[in-house]
């Protein structure tokens, strides 16, 4: 099993990094391509394990899929309607196949998904939304099965709670429904806006994405088109935190400050000099004191849960006392005991972690437990004294495109080993 071997240094991380396209936009966009009847081309797609799995799934459904820079999908030849367990067992995003399949073909089934072990991520909201659009849902032998006679029907849907995944499922399915769908209490993440932009390029009529009310006027068919995936705001934030905790200066290219305003505000509060341009962001921590910040995760435009682990590390290395409260997912502090193995000080109370500042961390053997936690462990290894081995890095490969190469370009001593 592959690992990262990191030799820590007190040398700051300095340089430029090109940010990849957002996994959390690329995945729903690739699944949404099932809705189209003509070829689509998707650019700026990151090279990730989940992307490879999704491309393989689309092929299994009968689509023609290739990658030559951009990802090309011809969904006109789809003739299978089941996403099998052997393909989707490691990837919860596979639930996004269900809405497009039932919307276009009147049927679809998806094995109940896997993915990160960070608490309950129920598919109930996806199922309820599809039922409100007229689909009949059954659960059999570990599969969610959706069927409808004719077309789905537009509806007024009020989501019980804000859910990025369910917002995408309902929006995609409603694109081919008969009539208009109004989705209230919708999630507002940039990746939802990007998915809506993609669908509109194919001929969908979606308005309001990025607000809490999305309106979808159903159309009879979607054609082909080209789209470039939005920048990954979480990868951006991860490298900016790496600059901050190492006392360095990093410029992130191919990204935009409006995607992560809450994160940039907290970096400034932590003492960093933050500058932004049209397609770049820089954080400069040279000769500045790192200060702890208090954070409460929240749906967009609040502070993203996917940046919580990185800021937990920041608080551990900062002066003062910062309190981080996790409101989105349960059981999302599994990185804390691993960081404590490296000498960090922290106390977990329910859904809150309180960090004490330490002068330095020491290298240790640690284990990645989920995607974002693994990133915080790798960054911790970069600034620790001695050698850190990060095990189970398949987690990080699910969400970061060549993170070791990008960190090495900033001066980190990191290599992938077996």
UniProtKB/Swiss-Prot annotation:
One Gene Ontology term, aspect cellular component: cytoplasm
Pfam families for the chain: EPSP_synthase
Record-annotated active site: 116 (proton donor)
InterPro entries to which the protein is assigned, alphabetical: Enolpyruvate_Tfrase_dom (IPR001986), Enolpyruvate_Tfrase_sf (IPR036968), MurA_subfamily (IPR050068), RNA3'P_cycl/enolpyr_Trfase_a/b (IPR013792), UDP_GlcNAc_COvinyl_MurA (IPR005750)
Residues recorded as bearing 2-(S-cysteinyl)pyruvic acid O-phosphothioketal in the entry: 116
Coiled coil: none
Biological process annotations from GO: cell division; cell wall organization; peptidoglycan biosynthetic process; regulation of cell shape; UDP-N-acetylgalactosamine biosynthetic process
Catalysed transformations (reactions): phosphoenolpyruvate + UDP-N-acetyl-alpha-D-glucosamine = UDP-N-acetyl-3-O-(1-carboxyvinyl)-alpha-D-glucosamine + phosphate
Pathway noted in the entry: Cell wall biogenesis; peptidoglycan biosynthesis
Protein residues bound to phosphoenolpyruvate: 23-24
Sorted UniProt keywords: Cell cycle, Cell division, Cell shape, Cell wall biogenesis/degradation, Cytoplasm, Peptidoglycan synthesis, Pyruvate, Transferase
PANTHER family found in the cross-reference section: UDP-N-ACETYLGLUCOSAMINE 1-CARBOXYVINYLTRANSFERASE
Entry similarity comment: Belongs to the EPSP synthase family. MurA subfamily.
UniProt-recorded name of the protein: UDP-N-acetylglucosamine 1-carboxyvinyltransferase
Species assigned in the record: Vibrio parahaemolyticus serotype O3:K6 (strain RIMD 2210633)
Source taxonomy: Bacteria, Pseudomonadati, Pseudomonadota, Gammaproteobacteria, Vibrionales
